[in-house]
Amino acid sequence: MSISNLILVLIGIAIAFLFTAAAESTTANNNEEKETQWSDIEYLIDANNDTMVNYKNLFGLNIGKVYNPNFVDDADWFLGSSNYEDHIGYYLIPYNYNWHFYSNISAPWYGCEAQSKAMLVTAKKYNETGDPKYLEFSKKVFNGLNSSVINHDGWLLGLVSKNKNATILNSQMFCVANLMTYYEYTGDERALTLFKKGVDVLEKNINDLSGNCGTYYSLSKNRLVSVKQHPEYMKMLERLYLMTGSEMLKNTLYKWQHDYLTCR
């Protein structure tokens, strides 16, 4: 998911940046760095061909090189003992770095995007290999997504931390759509049930989160996302509309498309 280059001044913007920066970059082969329009960030490939993010001294945070699970495509990386937490019956996929820009988010913190990424990558690996360890892992990650930690009555939290939780519109769209893909991989009816609940939540809230020439970033409605960022939002919403045939989502998609053409 890509987001236009903008000055991040709120915690919501900071979190949005973490979740969406990768799509702005282009992948390079072997150990070459990835290019990004944010000059202070690099996407690197480690010796195992896994993506690392070098945040350097972004916003003075001194995060340096870390693994952001949103950007990892290697099922075996997720199975590494330091990359998931076993909570007896479900797994959580942590972000193992602090994010203290206009916030107090200390590691570990969590969100539905990391959960759904790990869930899909390992389910896909199971389909490719038939190795049951990947299916078992994927199911426990789904259990984490469906747990009360992240699933709040159909809202799949985009941020879960000790001091702050956030219901984020683009995270909801992304994670709900991933549930349908997971269902297609596994046939797990629980995923289909949660998908339907997540769509219902979107249908009930998306009008309220659609403002004039923008959308509200989260239920807190403390930030309006500019229509300049809507191409990626529209792609996610269109994906959900094609999955559901929902008239509500279709009408909202048309509104966003109209706003994008007229409000810039």
Q: How should these model regions be labeled?
A:
Residues A14, F19, A23-V66, Y185, ...:
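Terminal, non-catalytic domain-edge segments
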Residues N48-F71, W109-N127, T167-Y183, L224-L242:
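Well-ordered alpha-helical segments within folded domains of soluble proteins
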Residues P94-Y95, I105-N205:
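Eukaryote-skewed repeat-based solenoidal scaffolds used as protein-protein interaction platforms
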Residues M1-I11:
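N-terminal Sec-pathway targeting helices
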Residues E32-D50, H87-Y110, D153-S171, S210-M236:
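Carbohydrate-binding/catalytic loop surfaces
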Residues P132, E189, L224-V227, E247:
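Charge-dense, low-complexity intrinsically disordered segments
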Residues I63-Y67, D74-K117:
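N-terminal accessory/assembly segment that mediates macromolecular interactions
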Residues N30-N48, Y67-L92, L135-W155, R190-G214, ...:
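Long, well-ordered core segments of solenoidal/helical folds
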